[in-house]
UniProtKB/Swiss-Prot annotation:
UniProt GO BP: positive regulation of single-species biofilm formation
InterPro entries referenced in this protein's UniProt entry, alphabetically: DegQ (IPR012554)
Species: Bacillus amyloliquefaciens (Bacillus velezensis)
UniProt protein name: Degradation enzyme regulation protein DegQ
Main function: Stimulates the phosphotransfer from phospho-DegS to DegU. Affects protease and levansucrose production.
Coiled coil: none
Entries under NCBIfam families matching the protein: reg_protDegQ_Bacil (NF041457)
Chain's gene name: degQ
Family the entry assigns: Belongs to the DegQ family.
Pfam families linked: DegQ
Amino acid sequence: MEKKLEEVKQLLFRLENDIRETTDSLRNINKSIDQLDKFSYAMKIS
């Protein structure tokens, strides 16, 4: 039982890290999209 609990803790820890990395990646993607939108808008009005 103790071993199973430790395995579950490890899995949850890894999952938490994966979620954090995914969130950071999505945030970076959103920043890139915002920059592209600003660039596209600037090209339209120039």
